[in-house]
A protein has these predicted regions:
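Class I S-adenosyl-L-methionine-dependent methyltransferase catalytic core
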Residues: 1-123
Length: 123
C-alpha cells in the first residue's frame, strides 16, 4: 500500500516543530524538490487567497480546501480555467459547539498547465 508522506510544511506562524515559518508566496520550486503536490487549507479572504492561487499552482499541482461556492464567483473564473478537479466533501465543523456549520467545502486541484475541463466528484 502506498502511503503519503509530508515532505514540506510551512505556515505564517509557528505551529509544529517541523514547520517552517514563512509566507507561502515566498516558496520556490527548489524548496519543493521531491514533492509531488501542494496541499493547503488557505485563508478564504480574497486579499490573502488570490496571491496563493497566483503562486502555488505555478510550483506544483496544488489542492486547496475552499468553500464550495467559490467556484461560482466571477473573480474565480480565470482560476477555474486551471482547475483540474473539484471534489465535494460537504459541511465541515471546525470546532465542537452547538452551532453546526452551514458552509459546504470542496477540494480544488489547480495546475498552471491544465487545459482540459474541470472534473467534478460529488459526495
Amino acid at each position: 500500500m502506498e502511503v503519503a508522506t509530508c515532505k514540506w510544511r510551512s505556515d505564517v506562524r509557528e505551529t509544529v516543530g517541523s514547520s517552517k515559518v514563512m509566507d507561502a508566496t515566498d516558496i520556490t520550486k527548489g524548496m519543493l524538490t521531491g514533492c509531488d503536490m501542494i496541499i493547503t487549507n488557505p485563508p478564504f479572504s480574497w486579499g490573502l487567497l488570490k496571491p496563493l492561487l497566483d503562486h502555488l499552482p505555478t510550483l506544483k499541482p496544488t489542492w486547496f480546501l475552499l468553500p464550495a461556492n467559490v467556484m461560482h464567483n466571477k473573480r474565480m473564473g480565470p482560476y477555474m480555467e486551471r482547475c483540474a478537479w473539484v471534489i465535494s466533501i460537504g459541511r465541515l465543523y471546525w470546532m465542537e459547539n452547538k452551532v453546526r456549520g452551514v458552509d459546504d467545502f470542496a477540494w480544488f486541484r489547480f495546475h498552471e498547465e491544465w487545459e482540459d475541463d474541470t472534473r467534478f466528484i460529488g459526495r
